[in-house]
Amino acid sequence: SFPLFYSTSFGGAYWVWMLILLCFVIQAVSYEYQAKKGNLLGKKTYQVFLMINGIAGPILLGTAVATFFNGAEFIVNKEQLTDVAMPVISTWANPWHGLEAALVFWNLCLGLAVFFLARALALLYFINNIDDPEIVAKSRKQLIPETILFLVFFLTFLIRLLLVDGFAVNPDTGEV
């Protein structure tokens, strides 16, 4: 069961992982080209790309990881192994092929928790490594709302995860 589930989950969530990769690529390109003289798109465009990566990257990463806990909409049919026309045993149950994960509320809770955790960790880095009293004071002030928002989204996700009905396979019938 392990390879069957994860082959679909990773393969089908291909588009979510590609969006995450796109975020990381635009970050790398933006850092490289934003200050270069005569860049094609202008400095502001590359700064917008950095903002997109800073927001979408952690949220998408969190939603992709949340699918491991919340599941995804696909069907496993082992009988298809014998079908020459369709030798794939797992198929997506909708035309979105895993992109719907980014719109599931519970997945977004973990995505937003990762986003606010990243911001809190960045502020802690500033506090510990920058020797500027003004920046440290602003970072300390901003750390409180970031931590509160992280806790709200993470605890919402965690409490729901602990209280939701789970699934199990009946060993006698093989039914879920």
Locate the predicted segments by residue.
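Membrane-interface segments at the starts/ends of alpha-helical transmembrane spans
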Residues: S7-T8, I89-F105
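Cytosolic juxtamembrane amphipathic/interface segments immediately preceding
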Residues: G38-T45, P95-L99, D132-P133
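Membrane-interfacial helical/loop segments at transmembrane boundaries in membrane proteins
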Residues: I75-W96, A168-V176
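Alpha-helical transmembrane segments
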Residues: I127-V136
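Hydrophobic cores of alpha-helical transmembrane segments in multi-pass integral membrane proteins
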Residues: S1-G38, K43-A72, W106-F126, R140-V176
